[in-house]
């Protein structure tokens, strides 16, 4: 199971992203194992213009959603404390996304190196991609 992070979606949907980068990302979004998480949807829709939000929602409808049960919020807080104990400062939504991935035993696919740091303090499985294109 794969959880596609916000960073891939942003680069894939941004009109200014180079086509080679979009071609690099597309197989991940089309992978049958690809899933969304509610915090990722929130991050993407938060700043989207109305027409962009409609397009995103249409794309999101094609992927299964990993739920964020109430226990995951506590797990995210615990993860944040573990990171802080190792001197890592991680934003709250990244902790929540990581906790969702851990809860569902999904591999998080991302360009965001902060998740590699989170993986140092947990069992988080991360596929850290490098931007090509």
Regions found by a protein language model. Name each.
Residues 1, 98, 102-133:
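Acidic, PIN/NYN-like endoribonuclease modules and their adjacent C-terminal/linker elements
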Residues 1-36, 45-58, 133:
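Short, well-structured N-terminal submotif of metal-dependent ribonuclease cores
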Residues 4, 36-37, 68, 110:
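A conserved hydrophobic position in a structured secondary element of the catalytic/binding core
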Residues 5-6, 44, 76, 101:
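Generic structural signal for small/hydrophobic residues in well-ordered secondary structure
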Residues 8, 40, 72, 97, ...:
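Alpha-helix capping/helix-boundary segments
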Residues 22, 41, 53-56, 73-76, ...:
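A general structural signal for well-ordered alpha-helical segments in protein cores
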Residues 35, 66, 127:
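General small-molecule cofactor/ligand-binding pocket signal
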Residues 64-111:
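Active-site neighborhoods of divalent-metal-dependent phosphate/nucleic-acid chemistry enzymes
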């Amino acid at each position: 199971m794969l959880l596609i992070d916000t960073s891939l979606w942003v680069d894939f949907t941004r009109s200014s992203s180079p086509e080679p980068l979009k071609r690099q990302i597309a197989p991940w979004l089309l992978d049958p194992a690809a899933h969304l998480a509610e915090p990722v949807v929130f991050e993407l829709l938060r700043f989207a213009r109305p027409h962009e939000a409609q397009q995103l929602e249409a794309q999101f409808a094609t992927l299964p959603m990993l739920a964020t049960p109430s226990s995951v919020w506590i797990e995210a807080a615990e993860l944040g404390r573990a990171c802080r104990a190792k001197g890592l400062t991680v934003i709250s939504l990244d902790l929540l996304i990581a906790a969702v991935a851990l809860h569902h035993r999904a591999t998080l696919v991302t360009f965001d190196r902060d998740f590699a740091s989170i993986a140092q303090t947990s069992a988080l499985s991360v596929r850290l991609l490098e931007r090509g294109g």
